Amino acid sequence: MSVRSYVAMTCAGAVALSSSLAFAHVSVSSPGFANQSQLLTFGIGHGCEGADTSKLEVTIPSSVTSVRVVPNVFGPVEIKKDDAGNVTGVIWTNPQPRAADEMYYQLSIRAKLPDAPFTTVLFPAKQTCKDKDGKESVVDWKATPEEVAAAKEGEEPEPAPAVLIVPVRKLGWNKFTIKEKLTDLTAFDDAQIVWSGAAAYSSNPATKDQIKNEDGVTELKEIAAGAEVWVKY
């Protein structure tokens, strides 16, 4: 059975697009759609050395616009703006930190992401914690993916919350032009299959095996700038 036929038969088993929130650090729901307003939720997976989170300050990049803060469990928030009135940061303060680090918090905004498919937007965050004795500690979640990848043994840079931007799509086949070279194909992990010429990519293990065993088909590992791809969702 060909890869194309196999994918058509396994449509019902395709992975649906979902917002992921990591539980190991401060994260943000991802992916997000290019040039669209949507809910972005920051997840605070843990406090600091056993202390509860007392405050989270998130920097809003200039490419992210139309920011609105969603009511949250912490209560009133501080919204920082520049001289033009653009939101540059949001500060959530927990009025009653718990005596122990035992909560998973979610804090949300609604915002419009830039029209830049297959790029990543970072939201540097500063997490403040307060223990039962009132002692504060701070963690800066600001490292870029490049800094995290380049970290030496023993180094543990704190990654900034990141949103992977994907183009708006429809069910079925979609044709996209890649503007910049793409070496990380996880942007397509919710797709059934991606084709670029005679090369194909899928995050689905069964489809991946079909790609490897199909005559005349190679595994797609990166996509050149300017290349056209066909993606089935």
Question: Model-derived features: where do they sit?
Answer:
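Boundary at the C-terminal end of the N-terminal hydrophobic targeting segment
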Residues: A22-A24
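Low-complexity, serine/threonine/proline/glycine-rich extracellular segments that form mucin-like
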Residues: S29-P71
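Short, solvent-exposed loop/turn segments enriched in Ser/Thr/Gly
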Residues: N35-L40, D52, Y105, T119-F123, ...
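Extracellular adhesion/glycan-binding regions together with long Ser/Thr-
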Residues: E78-E102
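Low-complexity, intrinsically disordered segments enriched in Ser/Thr together with acidic residues
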Residues: P95-T119
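Extracytoplasmic/periplasmic copper-protein system
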Residues: K130-L171
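N-terminal exported-region signature
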Residues: V168-Y233
